[in-house]
């Protein structure tokens, strides 16, 4: 085995086909062949069989749900792995054990060990290799349980070789339509591809069209379905920029909940209350989904006490999702990148910053529903700065500007992302909210630039005084 440095290991991983960098490709079983993933894992000793797992698919919210679950499992004393993608700042964010990133030297070591086995399996992709790397790390670290987030779709995703204790399907909406299908039913069918025979499914609230597809798929596999909003009920509590609370209860407790509400909280019984640092009503739903999945995992021997769920929810970290970086001026980084998440962002802005003018820093991948995102966001925006992330799929800012001008909003074009953020801060007026959205890659570049630009915020605030 030839030793590698961390940069050499990354170069090796990225030397394979990386579909995340391509705008179009064929989404089929011939291109995404799970047999080759199984072949590689078998050569590595099937590391994925060495730990319990929870599998999370969905269009939106799957990362937040995964982070909430992993944080709670860790709080309960389980040695917990967490695999997510893509990363915002560092490759090592994708693979966590005990909420700690995989060390760079471990990446280099495991990739070097994998190389001869990879050479024996033709056609592997970057994501397939990284998935195998994550499983190998989890096995090497002897984790008790891993939370595994699907990369794309579900049916043909490289993660779909695990046999989980619970399959989780979060909110489904329109994204990756050129790959997964033009209808919500087609998208739901791809996501439902993670359902395994007899393995319980936790399903987030869905549009009826998507719900029916998932229920049919689960029925075919003999997989029981736990529906959040039916089998577990939830409601938001208080919220501010520091976080929010929520209540979760069972249908059997509904009469008690009714009495609690009618008495304005004077009843002796009160529904369980949880606190999360993640903002926006959609995160209340995600927390309820995470709770239902953890409760469902009880039957598989993974018991997380209520106190651990509370502690895990309170300490969960999932950056780039309506994350407030500054309050004066207000600077919010979000990763909304389809129409549904753009709508949720607009609702969150109205909820947390009612009536305040918004400057939007917007960049998107060229394969996303850019007109749909603009239709949701631009009515709430007083000034728009279009920009471009350093990514092969990033849309041309001039094209974004042309689309935006049809909405009658003031548009400025400025790249890179760091320059766009600096301009927004320099021109911020009292009470204005600066928001970045449209792409995970834009969110990542905002977060990367923030430590330096934070000084500009301080100086601008001081000058205003």
Predicted regions and their residues:
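Charged, amphipathic alpha-helical linker segments immediately N-terminal to NTP-binding catalytic cores
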Residues: 1-27
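ATP-dependent carboxylate-amine ligase catalytic core
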Residues: 21-34, 38-53, 75-162, 178-181, ...
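Hydrophobic positions on the alpha1 helix immediately C-terminal to the Walker A/P-loop
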Residues: 64-68
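Short internal beta-strands
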Residues: 83, 200-205, 359-362, 382-390
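Extended acidic/charged loop-beta regions that coordinate divalent cations
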Residues: 86, 130-179, 212-270
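Nucleotide phosphate-binding/pyrophosphate-handling subdomain across enzymes
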Residues: 145-150, 157-168, 172-174, 186, ...
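C-terminal helical cap/extension that packs against the catalytic core
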Residues: 207-217, 222, 330-333, 339, ...
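Short, flexible loop segments at boundaries between secondary-structure elements
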Residues: 389-391, 455-465
